[in-house]
Amino acid sequence: MDPSSKSPDDDDLRPEAEAARRPQPQPQPREWRFAQVFGERAAGEDVQEVDIISAIEFDKSGDHLATGDRGGRVVLFERTDSRDSASRSELERQDYPIARHPEFRYKTEFQSHEPEFDYLKSLEIEEKINKIKWCQTANNALFLLSTNDKTIKYWKVQERKVKRISVMNLNTSQSSGNGTTSSSSSSSSRAILPNGGCSEKLYNFPNNDLLFPPGGCTSLRLPVVVTGQDLNLVPRCRRVYSHAHDYHINSISNNSDGETYISADDLRINLWNLEISNQSFNIVDVKPANMEDLTEVITCAEFHPTHCNTLAYSSSKGSIRLIDLRQSALCDNHAKLFEEHEAPGSRSFFTEIIASVSDIKFARDGRHILSRDYMTLKLWDINMDSGPVATFQVHEYLRPKLCDLYENDSIFDKFECCLSGDGLRVATGSYSNLFRVFGCTPGSAEATTLEASRNPMRRQVANPTRPARTLTSLTRAVRRGGENPGVDANGNSYDLSTKLLHLAWHPTENSIACAAANSLYMYYA
């Protein structure tokens, strides 16, 4: 037999082939640590409604973070720690990568939206920021989209050198900002006339800030604009996209082509060009001819991260539709439909309410879609529309309380979701300022509950026995009006008035930013 020849089965004897057949080890659960907090609330401090955070978004690089609040403001943060600070020799000595402490600092803020009133519909339009999306950077400038219920704005934030006016023709050395002379000795040196006047003529220019020198001006000097070395961040609104939605805007999403984006309300999805603010194209319209025939509304819409012709949108019936913009101008027909069929006999009054999808996110590679409804997270494979590949129970202990949640409208809360950049984990929020992180690799049992506080792992302490309800705890519940109506699966009390709706995962690192009322908490693993 020729030694150079071999049978096809010989490859199976190689070590790498044998290793490939072995079950792959599961990623170890991450230990999450507190990194930073901005706007931390003191004990007993009341939170102003306008300060509550309503949107969070990392940019594509992860070096900038934007938040929006109910007061219509956008706040920008930038990363200050160097991700490449370790030397090569230090990295070579490490057996495993060490989790670095990510640090962000306040960069700037600006008023994005103001409260308005629609006189034709007698409708108040609040200034609350619903969504923020980062756009592609250019010339060291930051670009982002922000929207409230009706109007989308395109912002440019750039550093500019501060310009000052120098070589003034008038003497400003003896004046101060409040219009009075800055030196008491100079004012006392003037001769005071019997009628209370002054021997020197004082000409009042704006706020008495400028004084003519004694004897008048001998020569005329033009002011000179001098550019200093100080830098100042200047936000500027480049475009305003308005009058295109009859219903409240719930989503905006940038296209991977860098030129277009979509905006979605309850019944329509519009396609915009970033440079054209007076024209948009309606690509999805689910409004029936008779509004009495309306059975579902659009809840969220998201572009595919790499395919500029593909987008997904979710509905209040729990379905997700994938559409291809190349099929037709008006995408009435979907390319794929993702929905989970309910078990026979399991339908109740609350089934459709809790099935409504509040948020969807594409994975970074575009292969999977993560969706959040009231009770669960679902992970979908876009190549398999028969059902989700994984379902994660977020707060199953609330299922017996659905009637109470319906009475106080908590059942309509819209929780967001996010995925890690490597696609190995997903996260979403819950009540009592808690959020949960799940491992989504096949066979993973990772399910971590974290609290938005300086001690995120506080809720991890096992509590096998249900605490006894003493007289003190009973009177506390009555006094607070039942804000803590029960306990979760671990025996910890839950508070429906404190809910963590908004969070975002860093695009390349295991770092999560989440909002608890007016406070922004950041964690890393």
Swiss-Prot record:
GO cellular component, one term: protein phosphatase type 2A complex
Biased segments, Low complexity type: 171-189
GO molecular function, one term: protein phosphatase regulator activity
Record flagged with keyword Cytoplasm: no
Spans of repeat WD: 48-87, 124-165, 244-282, 293-333, 352-390, 495-525
Annotated keywords: Repeat, WD repeat
Entries under InterPro entries matching the protein: PP2A_PR55, PP2A_PR55_CS, WD40/YVTN_repeat-like_dom_sf, WD40_repeat_dom_sf, WD40_rpt
Family, per entry: Belongs to the phosphatase 2A regulatory subunit B family.
Function (record text): The B regulatory subunit may modulate substrate selectivity and catalytic activity, and may also direct the localization of the catalytic enzyme to a particular subcellular compartment.
Assembly notes: PP2A consists of a common heteromeric enzyme, composed of a catalytic subunit (subunits C), a constant regulatory subunit (subunit A), and a variety of regulatory subunits such as subunits B (the R2/B/PR55/B55, R3/B''/PR72/PR130/PR59 and R5/B'/B56 families).
Official protein name in the record: Serine/threonine protein phosphatase 2A 55 kDa regulatory subunit B beta isoform
Organism annotation: Oryza sativa subsp. japonica
